[in-house]
């Protein structure tokens, strides 16, 4: 049986901020699904190992082990974690040694009896469909290209009837509720794409959801206008949210605009936090990451929030801001476009201590009934030490 592996970028740079060194690229969401899950769907098997050392020690409990690259024996398939397959089954024929997308190698086929020692450009290739990701900002591009089809894939699932008292604009068949609680007065606009409300989620009165959109298990939409966005598990959201992806366990329980943004795990956004997602010049957005300038090629980029980042009440974030892992954004000044890992405030260069970060993380996770196990503590401790040293 063919074994599936994923290969991380050897040394991801600023283009993958604020997640380089924090979590594997394979565990980021491209559309509804994590990149790893997309490879698993395309290959028809689960990933055995993710090869990569930049996020050594990462652990959340449901991901494959993360190890340094070493030779492997076939039969195997190795996928690049910077590529998101569309889910079309991959069936390499006899003699195929590489998977390519627009002339770029994004995977390798290792037949039985052969050994693979690392990336190469040798042998016949099979063209596959998907999206090449240049950095974290291209998770927004994934929403543009993948979300509509991701939501449409749910249409065949046996869902609940249209919730009583809700208003559906468009064909009700494009609303999929899978064991969710929906209060009367919710508006679902499915004229431009399906809306999927997954198991155990809750949509409260005063919410309007415009498809394509996905609300993950256990997530609560507390009110406001949601369009073109993805929410992973156990998020709390309110206000206006447009073309954004929330990985999971994030908290935005108050008013404020979040547009064209990526929100990592365990992020907490204070009341009124607002992102700018468009320059006054209507020019392409450039990121600034620790002195490095990165061209996104995109007109709309809001803020990229790293895991465990937090903002104070009324925080106003410029277009193309990067808030690194564990950073606490507060103060009377406009935040800079780059906020380093575990920053304490926007000025003065102060940083959180390791003990302080772990103490807050334990409080936050306990409130969501997530066990702060010794293994999780150790994983976060290693993340702190690794990112501070970068």
Predicted regions and their residues:
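Active-site-proximal helix/loop capping residues that flank conserved catalytic or ligand/cofactor
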Residues: 34-37, 137, 178, 217, ...
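Terminal amphipathic alpha-helical/low-complexity segments used for targeting or macromolecular assembly
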Residues: 1-173, 332-337, 341-390
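Generic, low-specificity signal for short hydrophobic/alpha-helical stretches with a mild N-terminal bias
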Residues: 18-21, 121-125, 162, 183, ...
């Amino acid at each position: 049986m063919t074994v599936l592996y994923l290969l991380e970028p050897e040394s991801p740079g600023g283009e993958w901020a604020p997640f380089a060194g924090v979590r594997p690229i394979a565990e980021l969401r491209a559309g509804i699904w994590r990149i790893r899950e997309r490879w698993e769907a395309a290959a028809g098997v689960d990933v055995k190992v993710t090869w990569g050392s930049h996020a050594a020690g990462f652990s959340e409990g449901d991901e494959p082990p993360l190890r340094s690259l070493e030779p492997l024996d076939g039969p195997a398939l190795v996928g690049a974690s910077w590529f998101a397959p569309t889910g079309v089954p991959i069936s390499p024929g006899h003699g195929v040694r590489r998977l390519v997308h627009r002339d770029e190698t994004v995977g390798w086929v290792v037949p039985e009896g052969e050994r693979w020692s690392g990336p190469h450009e040798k042998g016949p290739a099979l063209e596959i469909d998907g999206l090449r990701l240049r950095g974290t900002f291209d998770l927004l591009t994934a929403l543009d290209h993948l979300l509509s089809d991701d939501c449409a894939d749910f249409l065949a699932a046996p869902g609940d009837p249209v919730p009583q008292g809700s208003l559906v604009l468009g064909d009700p068949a494009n609303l999929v509720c899978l064991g969710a609680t929906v209060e009367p007065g919710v508006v679902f606009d499915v004229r431009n794409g399906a809306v999927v409300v997954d198991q155990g989620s809750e949509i409260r009165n005063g919410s309007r959801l415009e498809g394509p959109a996905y609300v993950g298990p256990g997530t609560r939409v507390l009110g406001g206008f949601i369009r073109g966005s993805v929410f992973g598990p156990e998020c709390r959201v309110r206000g206006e949210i447009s073309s954004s992806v929330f990985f999971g366990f994030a908290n935005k329980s108050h008013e404020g605009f979040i547009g064209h943004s990526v929100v990592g795990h365990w992020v907490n956004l204070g009341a009124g936090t607002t992102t700018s997602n468009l320059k006054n010049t209507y020019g392409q957005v450039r990121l600034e990451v620790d002195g490095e300038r990165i061209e996104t090629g995109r007109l709309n980029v809001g803020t990229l929030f790293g895991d465990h980042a937090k903002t104070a009440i009324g925080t106003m974030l410029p277009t193309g801001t990067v808030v690194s892992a564990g950073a606490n954004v507060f103060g009377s000044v406009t935040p800079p476009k780059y906020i380093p890992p575990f920053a304490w405030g926007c000025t003065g260069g102060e940083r959180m201590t390791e003990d302080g970060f772990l103490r807050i993380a334990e409080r936050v996770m306990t409130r969501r009934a997530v066990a702060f196990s010794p293994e999780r503590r150790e994983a976060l401790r290693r993340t702190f030490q690794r990112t501070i040293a970068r």
